[in-house]
């Protein structure tokens, strides 16, 4: 697999195809010039970045932005790591990109950061975000591991904990998914997370690159790993599976939160992106390794899969050829296959992964069913009830003012007609008629349905003055309101955590008790 040279003055970028990978899609590779390297940049306090870059060490970079509350909450942690002897085997720096991806302009950012108190945190400023753009960084926080020779070895999008960071430095191919990841909440002491009720199913449906990326986007999916299943040999390589007739199928191991998704839900998502009538072929990929199949480890799941197949058969005249079999074996694919479309955004993908952002028919996945709120009075349940019925993320966001990852929630991309209610109490808050794509990474609205349904509070954290927004009835933390919204609609942007909301589709509003508000949607 080719690596991208980072410390050179010029690097070429494009579709990076691993040896013997899934059938390639022809794309224009193109080129991109990197006018500045890390060593030529300066830090926020005007020091040469080269001070922090020793050539005989790999470099672990954290990309962050001033508008990302999660990033801000982790600055102290990053400063601690930068001084910790455990991280001495690598250069550890952070990069901010003034003028890129909604970041403040250079002078404004410098002035803002000067008011913070992280004297030992290396913050390199890359004006215009050249480095972030060339590495396809579009989500904050994100991490990149650069080898001693300047090769990009790994890109991780999202927050990582100390154990994951150290594992990454020791081994760029480390399985970060096997390490504990705690949800971080700002300005409060971290508490232990509840044990998640997870289950696993194994899905084969053509090239695993696309299927893995697709399931990773689905709310409630904990992990998706590419591998080889139900073959005749042990520990096969990609070349074995492709050319030596081992009988394995390219398969994605999907681990999901059973309190948020059922197996039938997973199968509905699966059938959205595979042709169940195509024998040994999906997209451009042909061969028995590209067959379709659902492989289970719990015999009770066979009937659930059979029922889903029977339902799906009604949509087709041709017979379905999807296998419904017990899992005989599964072996993780090589590291270069894992997260392939994150490492190589222009790589081949035979499915439309955006379908992961579309809720299932009749489903509103942000909140478990049967939450038990009082729709008439919008009462807040007890804390014990909230811990039982909300997900860990929903609880931390609404009760402890935590912040979900930017661009992580399905509601950021949802624009179907309906209303958004408080996930805690059910109180109506926002309408789809007032929702717009602000590009900030969180669901954005120009106004609440009723101005009295939200309360505003001064928030002076992180050397900024912001206006926090909370729900009236349950006092749930929702997000913040900013004066940079569409001028023709009042000029406000309500930037709201998707985890604080529950979406009620227009066609379900009557049954859910919100029929009187349908006029706010139409």
From Swiss-Prot:
Entry keywords, A to Z: Disulfide bond, Electron transport, Multifunctional enzyme, Oxidoreductase, Redox-active center, Transport
Documented EC number(s): 1.8.4.11, 1.8.4.12
Changes seen on gene knockout: Hyperpiliated and hyperadherent.
Location of the Thioredoxin domain: 17-174
GO CC annotations on file: cytoplasm
Catalytic machinery residues: 207, 495 (nucleophile)
Start and end residues of each MsrB domain: 383-506
PROSITE patterns (alphabetical): MSRB, THIOREDOXIN_2
Coiled coil start-end: none
Enzyme class: oxidoreductase
Keyword Glycosyltransferase among record annotations: no
Gene3D superfamilies on file: Glutaredoxin, Peptide methionine sulfoxide reductase, Peptide methionine sulphoxide reductase MsrA
Taxonomy, superkingdom: Bacteria
InterPro entries in the record: Met_Sox_Rdtase_MsrA_dom, Met_Sox_Rdtase_MsrA_sf, Met_Sox_Rdtase_MsrB_dom, MsrA_MetSO_reductase, Mss4-like_sf, Redoxin, Thioredoxin-like_sf, Thioredoxin_domain
Sample GO molecular function, one term: peptide-methionine (S)-S-oxide reductase activity
Record flagged with keyword Acetylation: no
Catalytic activity line of the entry: L-methionyl-[protein] + [thioredoxin]-disulfide + H2O = L-methionyl-(S)-S-oxide-[protein] + [thioredoxin]-dithiol; [thioredoxin]-disulfide + L-methionine + H2O = L-methionine (S)-S-oxide + [thioredoxin]-dithiol; L-methionyl-[protein] + [thioredoxin]-disulfide + H2O = L-methionyl-(R)-S-oxide-[protein] + [thioredoxin]-dithiol
Gene Ontology terms describing biological process: cellular response to oxidative stress; protein modification process
Domain free text: Possesses 2 methionine sulfoxide reductase domains (A/MsrA and B/MsrB) and 1 N-terminal thioredoxin domain. The domain B exhibits a thioredoxin dependent methionine sulfoxide reductase activity; the Cys-495 is probably involved in the reduction of MetSO and in formation of the sulfenic acid derivative. The regeneration of Cys-495 is probably done via formation of a disulfide bond with Cys-440 followed by its reduction by thioredoxin.
Purpose: Has an important function as a repair enzyme for proteins that have been inactivated by oxidation. Catalyzes the reversible oxidation-reduction of methionine sulfoxide in proteins to methionine.
Family the entry assigns: In the N-terminal section; belongs to the thioredoxin family.
Stated name of the protein: Peptide methionine sulfoxide reductase MsrA/MsrB
Organism: Neisseria gonorrhoeae
Underlying gene: msrAB
